[in-house]
């Protein structure tokens, strides 16, 4: 039995829809700015259409990318960090797990930054991705308490600069947050954090290790996959 294409009832080609969604999630652009960029390339759409496409296909494209990512390996090292996000005046925390190659593994939103929240986040990440060899964190006491309960306290590595990889992974999210003029609901934050991280991984090449031509070619390939 053949499955129905998710683009069946759309007049615009799947390539244009994918391009618009990738532009919006990858770069700190507004819906109107994506509309203007596509208009300059001969594609006449409304900014509300871009919004609809992101809502409809953002998670789908992220899911396709997630299926093709590398799985667990023996010398895996994770970096954990959290950043606060304000929603309607209330402070929430976006927890993030990043591996030693800079790939974002998991994002999780909580109201608090205590032991229970850290434990819930770590269990969720380990169930999905397996158990790492080393887990690098900052000196937040919640991590140590959660690790002791789970039984992985011997794998924790605390340090300032050693956790820069995870802290740097927050930067694209912060730029995107400013462009969106903050999030309105926790569900919107969790949803966007999840698919933004997958698309970030998809385009996250080691630019300093490659020639300009190779880097640009890989970026073009990633955009069309």
What are these regions, as identified by a protein language model?
Residues 73-87:
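Two-metal-ion RNase H-like nuclease active-site motif
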Residues 169-185, 196-197, 201-203:
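Active-site proximal helix-loop segment of RNase H-like, two-metal nucleases, encompassing DDE(D)
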Residues 30-43:
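DNA-recognition alpha helix
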């Amino acid at each position: 039995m053949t499955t129905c294409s998710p683009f069946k009832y759309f007049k615009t080609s799947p390539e244009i829809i994918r391009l618009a969604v990738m532009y919006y999630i990858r770069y700190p652009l507004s819906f109107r700015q994506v509309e203007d960029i596509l208009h300059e390339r001969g594609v006449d759409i409304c900014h509300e259409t871009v919004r609809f496409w992101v809502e409809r296909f953002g998670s789908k494209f992220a899911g396709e990318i997630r299926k093709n990512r590398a799985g667990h390996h023996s010398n895996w090292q994770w970096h954990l960090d959290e950043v606060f996000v304000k929603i309607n005046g209330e402070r929430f925390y976006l927890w993030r797990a990043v591996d030693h190659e800079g790939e974002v593994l998991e994002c999780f939103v909580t109201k608090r930054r205590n032991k229970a929240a850290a434990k819930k986040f770590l269990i969720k990440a380990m169930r999905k991705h397996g158990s790492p060899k080393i887990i690098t964190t900052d000196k937040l006491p919640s991590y140590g308490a959660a690790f002791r309960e789970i039984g992985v306290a011997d794998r924790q590595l605390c340090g300032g600069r050693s956790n820069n990889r995870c802290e740097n992974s927050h930067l694209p999210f912060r730029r995107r947050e400013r462009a969106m003029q903050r999030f309105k609901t926790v569900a919107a934050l969790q949803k966007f954090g999840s698919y933004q991280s997958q698309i970030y991984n998809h385009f996250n090449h080691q630019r300093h290790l490659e020639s300009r031509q190779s880097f640009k070619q890989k970026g073009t390939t990633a955009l069309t996959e």
